[in-house]
A protein has these predicted regions:
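Terminal-region recognition feature
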Residues: 1-117
Length: 117
């Protein structure tokens, strides 16, 4: 697993932690496997929050759906999820992001085009 796809706990002066997962590039079967593995670790380690950084033009529908569903299940178990859109979040990137309770993006972020082929 490459460094950019790992979970990163942050600690300040307390025991509170947050996980970070990066979805970078096209969403493929390999992306799905990597992200689902990271989400399982977030669940097992009981992180109270997840920052999901998305910089993706999209990808396959099935892989995006599986990540979306896994994020919703994680939220049901009490983990707070925030999506942060990078330079681009389109198609499957947006689909994954809407599973978060909040989305943040820069004014110049290219966003949208769900379902356009």
């Amino acid at each position: 697993m490459q460094m950019r796809n790992m979970i990163w706990p942050w600690r300040r002066k307390s025991r509170r932690r947050m996980a970070r997962i990066v979805v970078d590039g096209p969403i493929t079967g390999a992306t799905r496997k990597r992200v689902l593995k990271a989400l399982r670790e977030v669940k097992q380690r009981e992180f109270p929050a997840l920052l999901l950084r998305i910089d993706s033009p999209g990808g396959t529908v099935g892989d995006s759906q599986e990540i979306h569903a896994a994020l919703l299940r994680l939220r049901e178990q009490g983990c707070r999820v925030v999506a942060s859109f990078g330079n681009i979040s389109a198609s499957g990137g947006v689909y994954i992001g809407v599973a978060a309770e909040k989305i943040v993006a820069n004014p110049g972020t290219i966003t949208g085009s769900i379902g356009v082929i």
